[in-house]
């Protein structure tokens, strides 16, 4: 199973968009406190639209609480622009295994000491950093979870769907 973990998220729109992606992909969302917004924030709810009840959300009091919760197994990946390994070069194909994709705060990322401790688990999305400091958090979460799902052959997701008012028929 795939998991997206957000360390101290600051921007409610990002968290809401990521929640919507989690609902669409059967991905568990882990939210690590403290947040830069109120969970009841109307903008957060609007960004997630009416999918909040479809998202499996796990709340953690801090980073150590999150780490304790995954200590029993699974693979942790820290997503950072400072990583050496490209996310698409990693094997996520085992869909029986828990894959935890941990994203840092939008403004400061993950704690530096923590990243050094988990250096081998760090992955990055390639980009031209001459023009841009970073990519949008919700876009990054979406790219990485869909790469994992692609390698897992999109098991559990609809590959073909017929809509009552299909605009292509």
Swiss-Prot record:
> Which species is listed as the source?
Lactococcus lactis subsp. cremoris (strain MG1363)
Per UniProt, which keywords does this protein have? Cytoplasm, Methyltransferase, S-adenosyl-L-methionine, Transferase, tRNA processing
Q: Where does this one sit in the cell? A: Cytoplasm
Where S-adenosyl-L-methionine binds, per the record, is at 79, 104, 125, 134
GO MF: RNA binding; tRNA (5-carboxymethylaminomethyluridine(34)-2'-O)-methyltransferase activity; tRNA (cytidine(34)-2'-O)-methyltransferase activity
Q: Could you confirm whether the keyword NADP appears in this record?
A: no
* EC number(s) reported in the record: 2.1.1.207
Identification of the protein by name = Putative tRNA (cytidine(34)-2'-O)-methyltransferase
Q: Which reaction does it catalyse?
A: cytidine(34) in tRNA + S-adenosyl-L-methionine = 2'-O-methylcytidine(34) in tRNA + S-adenosyl-L-homocysteine + H(+); 5-carboxymethylaminomethyluridine(34) in tRNA(Leu) + S-adenosyl-L-methionine = 5-carboxymethylaminomethyl-2'-O-methyluridine(34) in tRNA(Leu) + S-adenosyl-L-homocysteine + H(+)
Would I find Magnesium among this entry's keywords? no
Q: Which GO terms describe its biological process?
A: wobble position ribose methylation
Q: Provide one Gene Ontology cellular component.
A: cytoplasm
Family, according to the entry, reads as follows: Belongs to the class IV-like SAM-binding methyltransferase superfamily. RNA methyltransferase TrmH family. TrmL subfamily.
Gene3D superfamilies found in the cross-reference section: 3.40.1280.10
């Amino acid at each position: 199973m795939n998991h997206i973990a957000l360390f101290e998220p600051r921007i409610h729109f990002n968290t809401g968009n990521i929640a919507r992606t989690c609902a669409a992909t059967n991905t568990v969302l882990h939210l690590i406190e403290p947040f830069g917004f109120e969970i009841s924030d109307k903008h957060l709810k609007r960004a997630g639209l009416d999918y909040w009840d479809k998202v499996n959300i796990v709340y953690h009091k801090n980073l150590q609480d999150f780490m304790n919760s995954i200590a029993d197994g699974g693979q942790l990946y820290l997503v950072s622009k400072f990583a050496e390994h490209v996310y698409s070069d990693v094997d996520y194909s085992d869909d029986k295994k828990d894959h935890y994709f941990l994203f840092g705060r939008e403004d400061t990322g993950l704690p530096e000491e923590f990243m050094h401790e988990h250096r081998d688990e760090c992955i990055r999305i390639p980009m031209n950093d001459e023009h841009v400091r970073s990519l949008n958090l919700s876009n990054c979460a979406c790219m990485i979870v869909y790469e994992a799902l692609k390698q897992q052959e999109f098991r559990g997701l609809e590959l073909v769907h017929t809509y009552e008012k299909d605009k292509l028929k």
